[in-house]
Amino acid sequence: MLFRSLLDSLNKRLNFLNQVIEKLGLENITTVHYRAEDGARKAELREQFDCVVSRAVANMSTLCEYCLPYVKVGGCFVAYKSGNAEEEIDKAKKAVHLLGGVKENAIYFDLPDSDIGRSLVIVKKKEPTSKKYPRKAGLPSKEPLQ
């Protein structure tokens, strides 16, 4: 059985998602209210997920610090990015490595009926993430690992 958890720092978004889940009759989905940096320090969430997917909310280094601590060793992190993210991926190599990951693939595509490019960057988790990551709230975005 597939279980899904939706994490967000804003209750407003989670309330909306809970309404959608209820109206559509979706099962095995929970919403979790934490900042990414804080939730990843909770034993019940840290390195518990086979796959973590993010929307494009930050640069790749920051997204890795937000998301890789949630991924089990052997699992994957999929980052949704705008455009061709190759330069951003190159800048994030150190962060990916420090957090226990390795870039596995990047899939580039255009949104249907448009010429708007997007990317899915797939990072495989090879080693546990050090307990020092993620750093305290705000630091991953202010001072990305480079």
Regions picked out by a protein language model, each given a short descriptive name:
Residues 13-15, 85, 89:
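Short alpha-helix immediately C-terminal to the canonical SAM-binding loop
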Residues 1-2:
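Short, small-residue-biased leader/transition segments that mark boundaries at the very start
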Residues 7-48:
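S-adenosyl-L-methionine
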Residues 26, 71-73:
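Helix-to-beta-strand junctions that scaffold the AdoMet/dcAdoMet cofactor pocket
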Residues 47-56:
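Short SAM/SAH-binding signature in class I
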Residues 90-146:
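SAM/dcSAM-binding transferase cores
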Residues 58-67:
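A short, conserved alpha-helix within the catalytic core of class I
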Residues 74-87:
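Conserved beta-strand signature within the Rossmann-like core of class I S-adenosyl-L-methionine
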